[in-house]
């Protein structure tokens, strides 16, 4: 039996007795480009933080390549790269220094880390800014720098939480191109985003979370069929039905309006 790249079993998180993630079961196989969707506050970022070992679950387990992220953290974390939401970078380092530092921290030799850093700087169009301090970087440059640091060690699984948030079209295209290359080499990508067109274009399978529970999972054709949506239905239409924002006929569940715009 093939060992899944990512597996969550009964994953639960409570904050002051409020359920943020509710007994979530999820399996992502090797080489999948998995899109993880949900409304604001649905539990996406909380789930990702538990899967990568940044937030301890109240209950349940999270496995990376069959290794428990909490009982064997070094072994599990060595297999992953993480681009978290609201990433924090060392702003007094240059982009080149930060990416190289990340490579060494993941166990690469200084020479190998430096070599890979130069390749990543070129691939992500960061060459001209490589000697600038990160404190002077734009949002898009910071995202690309964080992505480079997350993938410098060629992780088995790459977790991306809102990688396109606040990113311009040029930086967005560079990031998409890199993700496509990673997918082609067999990297498993766990990808959370509110930009559904990008998810629809890139992902091989999608999961939808609402109120801390996984409410839909499958390929886009499978989700269309389960939602009784037509073949031309977009992922946005499928998503809105899955989270209960629209009725089966596509009309809004909540039709409240502003009285002064009526």
Residue locations for each model-derived region?
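Conserved ABC transporter NBD signature motif
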Residues: 60-71, 75-76
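Conserved ABC ATPase "signature" region
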Residues: 100, 104, 111-129
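Catalytic Walker B motif of ABC-type/P-loop ATPase nucleotide-binding domains
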Residues: 158-162
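Helical segment within the ABC ATPase nucleotide-binding domain
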Residues: 173-185
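ABC ATPase "signature
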Residues: 217-218
């Amino acid at each position: 039996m093939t060992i899944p790249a990512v597996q969550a079993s009964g994953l639960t998180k409570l904050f002051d007795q409020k359920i943020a993630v509710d007994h979530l079961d999820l399996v992502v196989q090797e080489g999948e480009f998995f899109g993880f969707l949900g409304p604001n506050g649905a539990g996406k970022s909380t789930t990702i933080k538990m899967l990568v070992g940044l937030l301890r679950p109240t209950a349940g387990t999270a496995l990376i390549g069959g290794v428990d992220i909490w009982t064997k953290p070094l072994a599990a974390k060595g297999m992953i790269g993480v681009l978290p939401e609201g990433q924090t970078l060392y702003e007094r380092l240059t982009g080149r220094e930060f990416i190289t530092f990340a490579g060494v921290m993941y166990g690469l030799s200084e020479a190998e880390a430096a070599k890979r850093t130069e390749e990543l700087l070129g691939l992500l169009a960061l060459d001209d800014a490589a000697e600038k301090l990160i404190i002077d970087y734009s949002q898009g440059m910071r995202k690309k720098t964080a992505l480079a640091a997350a993938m410098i060690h060629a992780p088995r699984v790459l977790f991306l939480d809102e990688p396109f948030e606040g990113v311009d079209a040029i930086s967005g295209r560079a990031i998409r191109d890199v993700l496509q290359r990673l997918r082609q080499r067999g990297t498993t990508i766990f990808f959370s985003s509110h930009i559904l067109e990008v998810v629809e274009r890139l992902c091989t399978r999608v999961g939808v979370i609402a109120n801390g529970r996984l409410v839909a999972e499958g390929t886009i054709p499978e989700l269309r069929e389960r939602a009784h949506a037509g073949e031309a239905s977009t992922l946005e239409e499928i998503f809105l039905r899955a989270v209960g924002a629209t009725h089966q006929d596509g009309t809004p569940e909540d039709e409240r309006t502003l009285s002064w715009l009526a």
